């Protein structure tokens, strides 16, 4: 059984909230029937199911990219009232907020970037059919800058293109939320593209740099997380502009009187104000902060006063015991003392 394939499949089914199926390798997926597997994945649009059935190898990578985006979201908001969690049905893209808030904007952007990042990485590593290194970045010499393309450049255009077709296919309805979601998807992918790296290697006698070959690589995903968190803090409130004939929204504009200015391509946009995320609310998708750990003395969002929304907090005391001050005695044993520490933990009421 292919251990790497089993691990990949495990990540996929875990991210989908499904039972961990211990099956081995891509051939096992085919044997089970791609249509059976794809029909069991919740929350996919018809176009996405068709892609899943035709490219089951890619759907595994998409699941990993989506989970990478969700993990980064949880890291960036780990100390806030909203910690990238939501109520509702779990899909390949996680549980989704029902309000078109700036938190929803961040979620869509980070997942779109995660899927594009994962697809591009899989192509570079030779783990997907129909793609590989960027063929246009091979051999061309940049005389003015003294280097030429070499190595294996990440084919970010393929990764973004494939991810766009799959991720955007879930936006079926023609309404303002769809326009918002599509804009934030594109913003996440655009920010990924803008943060691609150029790596180079020198060639020459005795360490000289007579010639230099360069190639493009993907950025660390944590770096994208920080960039998108800054975009979240500066998110733009927008509203739809409707066509006069069918009254359907056609594009988004910044929500200001007498203004028809559109947001920038890399802006995160939202159409509704955020709830306070203090209480569990099925209407908004908020899970509330009851039971969340908080910092008694911190003045920031992680502090108990803000995290618990004025409800107060519970104090939990526990003892931590460990071996300490260990010394080697001749001959031949080690003697240690037992150390202990009483610790307090605080959780929101």
From Swiss-Prot:
Keywords: Developmental protein, Disease variant, Disulfide bond, Extracellular matrix, Glycoprotein, Lipoprotein, Secreted, Signal, Wnt signaling pathway. GO terms for molecular function: cytokine activity; frizzled binding; receptor ligand activity; signaling receptor binding. A lipid is attached at residue 206 (O-palmitoleoyl serine). Changing residue 206 to A: Does not affect interaction with RECK. Residues 1-31 form the signal peptide. Disulfide bonds join 73-84, 123-131, 133-152, 200-214, 202-209, 278-309, 294-304, 308-348, 324-339, 326-336, 331-332. Expression is restricted to placenta, kidney, testis, uterus, fetal lung, and fetal and adult brain. Palmitoleoylation is required for efficient binding to frizzled receptors. Depalmitoleoylation leads to Wnt signaling pathway inhibition. One of its GO terms (cellular component) is endoplasmic reticulum lumen. It is found in: Secreted, Extracellular space, Extracellular matrix; Secreted. Changing residue 292 to C: In LPHAS; results in a loss of function mutation with some residual activity. Glycans are attached at residues 83, 127, 295. Residues 238-266 are annotated as: Disordered linker. The keyword Oxidoreductase does not apply. GO terms for biological process: angiogenesis; apoptotic process; asymmetric protein localization involved in cell fate determination; axonogenesis; canonical Wnt signaling pathway; cartilage condensation; cell fate commitment; cell proliferation in forebrain. Belongs to the Wnt family. Forms a soluble 1:1 complex with AFM; this prevents oligomerization and is required for prolonged biological activity. The complex with AFM may represent the physiological form in body fluids. Interacts with PORCN. Interacts (via intrinsically disordered linker region) with RECK; interaction with RECK confers ligand selectivity for Wnt7 in brain endothelial cells and allows these cells to selectively respond to Wnt7. Interacts with FZD5. Ligand for members of the frizzled family of seven transmembrane receptors that functions in the canonical Wnt/beta-catenin signaling pathway. Plays an important role in embryonic development, including dorsal versus ventral patterning during limb development, skeleton development and urogenital tract development. Required for central nervous system (CNS) angiogenesis and blood-brain barrier regulation. Required for normal, sexually dimorphic development of the Mullerian ducts, and for normal fertility in both sexes. The intrinsically disordered linker region is required for recognition by RECK in brain endothelial cells. It is linked to Limb pelvis hypoplasia aplasia syndrome: A syndrome of severe deficiency of the extremities due to hypo- or aplasia of one or more long bones of one or more limbs. Pelvic manifestations include hip dislocation, hypoplastic iliac bone and aplastic pubic bones. Thoracic deformity, unusual facies and genitourinary anomalies can be present. Fuhrmann syndrome: An autosomal recessive disorder characterized by severe bowing of femora, aplasia or hypoplasia of fibulae, hypoplasia of the pelvis, and congenital dislocation of the hip. Patients exhibit absence or coalescence of tarsal bones, absence of various metatarsals, hypoplasia and aplasia of toes, clinodactyly, hypoplasia of fingers and fingernails, and postaxial polydactyly. This is Protein Wnt-7a.
């Amino acid at each position: 059984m292919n251990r790497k394939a089993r691990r990949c499949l495990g990540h996929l089914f875990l991210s989908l909230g499904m039972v961990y199926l211990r099956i081995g390798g891509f051939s096992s997926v085919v044997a089970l029937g791609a249509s059976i597997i794809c029909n069991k994945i919740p929350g996919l649009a018809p176009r996405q199911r068709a892609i899943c059935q035709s490219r089951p190898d890619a759907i595994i990578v998409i699941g990993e990219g989506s989970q990478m985006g969700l993990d980064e979201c949880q890291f960036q908001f780990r100390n806030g009232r909203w910690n990238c969690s939501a109520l509702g049905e779990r899909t390949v893209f996680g549980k989704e907020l029902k309000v078109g808030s700036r938190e929803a904007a961040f979620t869509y952007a980070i997942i779109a970037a995660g899927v594009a990042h994962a697809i591009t990485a899989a192509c570079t590593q030779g783990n997907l059919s129909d793609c590989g290194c960027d063929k246009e970045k091979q051999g061309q010499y940049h005389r003015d800058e003294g280097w030429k393309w070499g190595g294996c450049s990440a084919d970010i255009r393929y990764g973004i293109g494939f991810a766009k077709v799959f991720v955007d296919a879930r936006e079926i309805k023609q309404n303002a939320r769809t326009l918002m979601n599509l804009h934030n998807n594109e913003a996440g992918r655009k920010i990924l593209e803008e943060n691609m790296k150029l790596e180079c290697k020198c060639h020459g006698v005795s360490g000289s740099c007579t010639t230099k070959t360069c190639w493009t690589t993907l950025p660390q995903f944590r770096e994208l997380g920080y960039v998108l968190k800054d975009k979240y803090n500066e998110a733009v409130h927008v509203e739809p502009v409707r066509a006069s004939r069918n009254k359907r929204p056609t594009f988004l504009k910044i929500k200001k009187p007498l203004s028809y200015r559109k947001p920038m391509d890399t802006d995160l946009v939202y159409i509704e104000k955020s709830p306070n995320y203090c209480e569990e609310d099925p209407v908004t998708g908020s899970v509330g902060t009851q039971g969340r750990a908080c910092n008694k003395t911190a003045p920031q969002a992680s502090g108990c006063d803000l995290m618990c929304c004025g409800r107060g907090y519970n104090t939990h005391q526990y003892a931590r015991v460990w071996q300490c001050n260990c010394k080697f005695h001749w001959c031949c044993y080690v003697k240690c003392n037992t150390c202990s520490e009483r610790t307090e933990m605080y959780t929101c009421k």
